[in-house]
Amino acid sequence: MHTWKMWAICTALAAHLPEEQALRQACLSCDATQSCNCSFMGLDFIPPGLTGKITVLNLAHNRIKVIRTHDLQKAVNLRTLLLQSNQISSIDEDSFGSQGKLELLDLSNNSLAHLSPVWFGPLFSLQHLRIQGNSYSDLGESSPFSSLRNLSSLHLGNPQFSIIRQGNFEGIVFLNTLRIDGDNLSQYEPGSLKSIRKINHMIISIRRIDVFSAVIRDLLHSAIWLDVRKLAFSVPEKIQLLRIMSSSFAKKISLKQCLFTDATVPEIVSILEGMPKLMEVEMKDCTLLGTGKWYKQIHANQSQSLRILTIENLSIEEFYLFTDLQSVLDLLSLFRKVTVENTKVFLVPCKLSQHLLSLEYLDLSANLLGDQSLEHSACQGAWPSLQTLNLSQNSLSDLKMTGKSLFHLRNLNLLDISENNFGEIPDMCEWPENLKYLNLSSTQIPKLTTCIPSTLEVLDVSANNLQDFGLQLPFLKELYLTKNHLKTLPEATDIPNLVAMSISRNKLNSFSKEEFESFKQMELLDASANNFICSCEFLSFIHHEAGIAQVLVGWPESYICDSPLTVRGAQVGSVQLSLMECHRSLLVSLICTLVFLFILILVVVGYKYHAVWYMRMTWAWLQAKRKPKRAPTKDICYDAFVSYSENDSNWVENIMVQQLEQACPPFRLCLHKRDFVPGKWIVDNIIDSIEKSHKTLFVLSEHFVQSEWCKYELDFSHFRLFDENNDVAILILLEPIQSQAIPKRFCKLRKIMNTKTYLEWPPDEEQQQMFWENLKAALKS
């Protein structure tokens, strides 16, 4: 029994391993989180080997045509399945039978000609379904979504989609987003969407007003945000079909890629004005055929809730003929937030501005406003409640005039005038007294002056040509200096309350501990994307400053060393310089000290062990060796060179010289007093005299061993002993001395005294005759 169990286990493992291997061969991009990216691989089928481990499977942008029953059978833990942009035309009925945990299914942009409720039956956990871009013309006779109780977002439709039937959405009670691409939708059965009680965001792309009217009738109380696309509001008579919208509970209406005319605008405004809960209207990428001559006066409904108007990229071909909008002045008084962006606005009529009594936010960015037109638009009494004004990407060029035009806006605290062309700015300007935020980025300002108001709490001067920052702004909390040419941090004393600063993409090389800590309130500093010089001081500060990682934005990946070359490209936080690079002066001082101590020790040791003597002797010996070899015997001039102390000269000159030079035969003696060549270096005289003498007589006494020149003569005689290997020295003890009195370095002479007989001058006259006989015999040997 045990054997059969083992065989079964081994067989299962053997089957499982080839499956996983097959998956890896077909799809090589499975990561540690069990997410497999098999997109753009030219697959014709779902790869085999899918296991229960996989949670995300991306098969988008392949050539898959069919999904079969067994393809996904083992992928029981799939949460996300992406099959968009394939060629899928057929799905077996139970293909998704094992995907009870699936939350997102994308079948968009395939070739499905029909939808089957059986496909989605097992997907009771599904939250997001995308089936747009296929070729089905309807959703079937019943609801394909009836079992999808947890569905949150649904995207359907395609160019062939033409009919929505009653019951197609049965089973769906709530949707966060429903998007229907119905450009060619021609038939809508009333009540089809009525089963959905609430849709937070309803997006419908549709071209027929009558069909749209039928759809809206079913969404009156369920759609919170109604997003309409590609609808042409061009025929006034057809606009009447939309009167039903006045009963809608929608809070926001978006009109995108729609068409309007002067004749239909008043009708549409009238409908929107009647919607009891409408708070926001948004128009994007629309076209207006007209010049604003709306002959029908629009009166404000004091009970209306509309507060926000957004117009972006509105195309008005004859914008230069546009009127002053007299017909809608009454409607504007309740608006709190208005955005008119990229719509070629070159002037806001003064009267219109004065009617915007409740306006708190105004965005006129990416338009054609100039200095003069702004002065007219912001006339006295205009925008009395305005707090935020965005005039970026216009044609402003005079900063002083801009400030003066807005000076009367007492409530204005945020002003964005970025991406204008101010250039040089004056020293003095007038500004609204409560201005707290000013955006002057990308305005080609080369230098900041006191024109900048001192009341600011936030200042953005990014992307200019600034070399430094020297303004005193005592209330400033946020400063943005990105993309300038600053080389150092600003002075903290000028901006003592700064909390956040961005100085990225400048010419900042480093900053010190003192500079960093001088900003007492600093919580965020973005100094990324600078060319840092990773000096020892900078690195030491970075590595040891507590909490700097929490302050620096983008740390550590955005802080890169530019120099030295050895660490270029490395992250500042990971660089460690050597001791030599960081403490060069200290190291040089230490080396010099050690060298000095070494020399001092050498001097002391040399003095103690007579190193100087050895050096002098070596030099003298080398000098002597460089001379021609010793003169032959016929060049010997003296029988002996006499080395003696000046204190013993009386005995040498009056006694020894008399005895030896007057002997028969006489001896020739060399005395330094008598025979040294005048003007010649003493050392050379000593060497020459010793070399020209057959013997060297040393008259030893206490005075002798204390004489410097006698020591020289002993030295050279000592070298001669070693060089010629003969006994040329004759020692005469004029008075008894201890052998220890002779310097220890003369080991050869000490050995002679210890091993050979030396002559000692006897005080007894009877013995002196014997002394002279022995001396003469030694000289002749």
UniProtKB/Swiss-Prot annotation:
Pfam families: LRR_8 (PF13855), TIR (PF01582). The chain crosses the membrane at residues 586-606. Highly expressed in ovary. Also detected in brain, heart, lung, liver, spleen and kidney, and at low levels in gizzard, muscle, testis and proventriculus. Glycans are attached at N37, N109, N150, N184, N301, N313, N390, N439. Residues 25-585 are extracellular. Residues 607-781 are cytoplasmic. Binds MYD88 (via TIR domain). This is Toll-like receptor 2 type-2. It comes from Gallus gallus (Chicken).
